Design a protein with these regions (language model features):
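Alpha-helical transmembrane segments and their immediate juxtamembrane cytosolic regions
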Residues: 1-229
């Protein structure tokens, strides 16, 4: 829908208002995820075969590859190599799901499971404080460097932290899930649709509320946070 609107307005409107142009750009932002999702799913069959052959060595090797790309990209300034991390980082995150599916993650020693979120969080803090990686895991306008373009080692340690935390809380979470099974089944059925359209809703709301003089408190204030609850 937004792609059609964008094409039509470019063809039919000579002087496109900046607000409308910006709204169309923002509404299309979530589609980056859809493209990567289709890419990862398309490569699932060969990645499963590699998983069966190499096991844990595969994600470890991919993580080393991500680090090498970061060193060459940021250290040597060879920006062309950054495209490799679009595959390595997102495929690595997806690869960990195979270990959950075949039970490998569930067979891990309890100490390893407990250590994973600690190591992941410690690594993330180190990269974003001692290292030069941005604190934001997404992209913040004005920052010279983003962790998502290209994907960086920071996203890998973030994945280790979150996956480790999920495994650590798995038993309790399964109990919660059983208690609200119908709600989870219903929301999971529409979660991708909500994700793809949520920026459109924000853009439309902004287009209506801003001209009406809706208050815009300073970023970070209590009023600013209250309007986002």
């Amino acid at each position: 829908v937004w792609l059609s609107i964008g094409v039509l307005t470019e063809l039919l409107v000579d002087d496109l208002p900046n607000v409308l142009d910006r709204a169309a750009d923002l509404a299309a932002l979530p589609f980056w995820f859809l493209g990567l999702y289709l890419f990862v799913v398309a490569l699932a069959p060969p990645m499963i075969r590699l998983h069966r052959r190499w096991g844990w060595w595969l994600p470890v090797g991919m993580a080393v590859g991500v680090l090498a790309v970061d060193v060459v990209y940021y250290g040597l300034g060879v920006t062309e190599i950054g495209v490799l991390n679009y595959a390595l980082v997102w495929l690595l995150a997806h690869q960990l799901g195979f270990f959950y599916a075949d039970g490998s993650q569930l067979d891990l020693n309890r100490r390893i499971v407990a250590a994973a979120p600690v190591v992941g969080l410690a690594g993330l803090v180190a990269l974003t404080t001692v290292g030069s990686y941005p604190v934001s895991m997404g992209g913040v306008p004005g920052d010279e460097r983003w962790n998502t373009t290209p994907p960086s080692l920071a996203l890998v340690v973030l994945t280790v932290w979150l996956v480790g935390l999920a495994l650590l809380l798995r038993r309790r979470a399964l109990g919660w899930a059983a208690a609200c099974h119908e709600f989870l089944a219903g929301t999971n059925g529409v979660v991708l649709t909500v994700f793809l359209w949520h920026v459109s809703a924000v853009a439309l709301a902004g287009g209506v509320l801003y001209p009406l003089g809706f208050p815009q408190p300073e970023t970070g204030t209590a009023a600013w946070w209250a309007l986002r609850q």
